Amino acid sequence: TMGSGAIASSAWLSACTCRTADRKTPAESREPDGSQMTYRANPNTGDRVSLLGYGMRRLPVEGGASGRENSDAPIDQEMVNRQVDYALAHGMNYFDTSPAYCQGRSERATGIALHRHPRSSYFIATKLSNFSPTTWSRRASQEMFENSLRELQTDYVDYLLLHGIGIGQKPMDEFYQRYIDNGILDWLVEQKSKGRIRNLGFSYHGDIRVFDLALRWHDEGKYHWDFAQIELNYLDWHYANEINPRNTDAEYLYDELHKRGIPVVIMEPLLGGRLARVPDYIVAKMKSREPEQSVASWAFRFAGTPEGVLAVLSGMTYMEHLRENLHTYSPLRPITPEEDAFLMQIADDIYNLKTIPCNECNYC
């Protein structure tokens, strides 16, 4: 979503001297220890979920790019298989996809990779991504769900989300048209009762009134949310609304979910990769405190520290990203109060640049 300084974000990225990647630290040069992965328990089901979740939105394509940006090159299925195998072998078990990801190819690629493993060894999260008005009818939305099962080669989804509640030109109207007026949310509740959906939740962007309505329904017992997915990182914790008045600070979103006991899945822990590419003077501050810790790992540790977080998603195109993130969560070293204060100061520094980068989520 475009922030108050987002028009200048490209200038921020190109004009300042930024580190685009850290050299591997000695720790990251070693093989990650899968036996040390941090897990969180889902209080609703008892699922033992890896704190690091695989976001299947930036799958590699032939030629080495990301399937999110390149609509022409085919998905590199062999590489997807290798990375999924590596993730599972090193303790990861949560894979998040959508009919909308990688120009509609993510679910199929994810299904091919995961189907080669025992179904009980992983959790699949996918979404009812009925963004287009052509998919708002009950029948079209039902078919989208059924197609997800076919593409993923499974007869049930572990975690099913209403995709992006709160977005659109008229967010409340679109929420009702996509999920309520057509009866599709009630139908999804019925599918859950049949075992075809194990956990039913939503991902949220945009209009806080829709988020608050969903939680009011939860409080009233009208609909029970088993989990929810929000954007959370150390910049958005206090500055999401300052950057863009359409957005809401992550602290509020997390607290509202956590006090209700709703497990939280985190997206955008790196703000679309931007928190791994900060100005050199911020890199220097981070390295002065933790010379062996990468810039990105600070953000991943922050996102994984709150006790109500079930999983932190990372869209990992390259094996090196997967390895580094496995190191960060095997096991997680929670952010200390002193480190939290340090990151809040870093967030102040970034915000005061007044060129806060767009995270390229494309929901706008």
Question: Which residue ranges define each predicted feature?
Answer:
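N-terminal binding-site loop/beta-alpha segment at the start of enzyme catalytic domains
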Residues: G3-Y122, D155, D186-W187, S193
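Active-site mouth loops of central-metabolism enzymes
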Residues: R57-E78, L128-A140, D173-E174, G206, ...
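Aromatic/hydrophobic pocket-lining residues that form the small-molecule binding cavity
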Residues: V80, S106, S141, F145, ...
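A short, structured active-site edge motif that brings together acidic residues
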Residues: S120-S132, L162-H163, Q229-L232
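CE4/NodB-like, metal-dependent polysaccharide N-deacetylase domain
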Residues: A140-L161, E190-K194
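Beta/alpha (TIM)-barrel catalytic core signal, keyed to glycine-rich beta->alpha loops juxtaposed to Asp/Glu
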Residues: I165-C364
